[in-house]
C-alpha cells in the first residue's frame, strides 16, 4: 500500500547515471532546519563589499524538562535551556521584509538550512560561525500588539 508512493518519492531524490557510463550513484541530501522561538534583537542589515546585503538577527529557542526519577517525575524541578541561533536572510524579498518587520521579542517560525562558515575578525584571526540561512519566516505574533 505505502510501498509505491515511497518508491516514487525516493526516485525523486536518487538519480542514476547510465550503467554503461558509470556505476556512480548521485544522490541528494537534506539540510533542513525548523525553528520556533522569540527574536533576541532587532535585525541589522549588513553588506560586505562585492556581496549582496544580508539581514541578521538572533532567535532564542527553549527546551524544558523535569528532573527526578519515575516516582517523582511529575513533581520534579523544571529545568530550562535556551539556545541562541544566528539567522541570516539573503533572499532579496524576504531579507527586506525581515529587516522591516522582525522585532525584538516577536515570536516567529523560521525554515532554512545550517551553514558553517569561516571569517577573519578585525584582528585577522580566523573564526568559525554557524548560522541558519532562512528560506521562510512566519510571523506568529506582533510584539507591539502584545504590549498594548
Curated annotation (Swiss-Prot):
GO BP terms: mitochondrial DNA replication; positive regulation of mitochondrial DNA replication; protein homotetramerization
CDD domains reported in the protein's UniProt record: SSB_OBF (cd04496)
Keyword line: Acetylation, DNA replication, DNA-binding, Mitochondrion, Mitochondrion nucleoid, Phosphoprotein, Transit peptide
Domain SSB: 30-141
One cellular-component annotation, GO: mitochondrial nucleoid
Parts forming coiled coils: none
Residues that bear N6-succinyllysine: 122
GO molecular function, one term: single-stranded DNA binding
Keyword check for Metal-binding: no
PROSITE patterns membership: SSB
Modified residues (N6-acetyllysine): 113
Protein name (record): Single-stranded DNA-binding protein, mitochondrial
Source organism of this protein record: Oryctolagus cuniculus (Rabbit)
